[in-house]
Design a protein with these regions (language model features):
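Alpha-helix N-cap/helix-initiation motif
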Residues: 26, 64-67, 121, 191-195
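Hydrophobic alpha-helical scaffolding
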Residues: 17, 39, 121-125, 165, ...
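Short, contiguous acidic/charged loop-to-helix segments that flank catalytic cores in large enzymes
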Residues: 178-198
Length: 207
């Protein structure tokens, strides 16, 4: 109730009969017993815990995890190359928001001011979009991820955005992405992307 950003984001089924109450209690105890003072501030601890859970979930999901999770080592490399100290940071397929989290960490680690960046993104998957909202809210990162999950090709949440930094790990080699309905799209300045592969479409959208 205290965080308006998470309204309608968090699940409301914690009381459902099939949920293992003992397991839920163990999870609550785990978070409750963390010694915040010894390991950092509460936002940092909760953020790292959430990131750890995402990575473990990704391990279980295997190849399917690519839809929402990019390994932190890959994201760190992208961020360190671009060095987004200030300006508009954009990810058109933001997954769980890893690019934004690492950007914030980079700025903090280099003595920068996180308030000098503006974060924009979106994701088509409703669950993944909610994961990103939670990931950023936990860390206190302000972001515009659209009012709801949306397909970037068919419902661009930021059509007028002129981003200073674009970081993304799009679903490569995506087929059946709806090319036939976007033949005359104004984004295809360098040619119409092939119907069987969305890679060129992603590149042109970002450009």
């Amino acid at each position: 109730k205290e965080n308006k950003r998470l309204k309608d984001i968090l699940p409301k089924n914690f009381a459902r009969p099939e949920l293992d109450k003992r397991r839920l209690g163990e999870v609550v105890d785990l978070f409750t017993n963390i010694q915040m003072i010894e390991h950092g501030n509460s936002k940092d601890i909760l953020g790292r815990t959430y990131e750890y859970c995402l990575s473990k979930f990704a391990e279980q999901e295997g190849k399917l995890a690519g839809e929402f999770y990019t390994p932190s080592c890959v994201v760190r490399t992208l961020v360190e190359v671009l060095q987004p100290f200030n300006g508009r940071v954009y990810d058109p397929c933001c997954g769980s928001g890893g690019m934004f989290v690492q950007s914030a960490k980079f700025i903090e680690n280099h003595g920068g001011n996180i308030n000098k960046i503006s974060v924009f993104g979106q994701d088509s998957n409703p669950t993944t979009w909610k994961m990103a909202q939670m990931n950023l809210a936990i860390r206190g990162i302000e972001a515009d991820l659209g009012k709801f999950n949306a397909d970037t090709f068919f419902n661009d949440c930021h059509p007028q955005l002129k981003a200073d930094f674009i970081m993304a790990n799009p679903p490569f080699n995506l087929s059946g992405w709806g090319a036939d309905k976007l033949v005359d799209d104004v984004r295809w300045q360098y040619g119409t992307p092939p119907a069987g592969n969305a890679n060129f479409a992603w590149l042109q959208h970002m450009i």
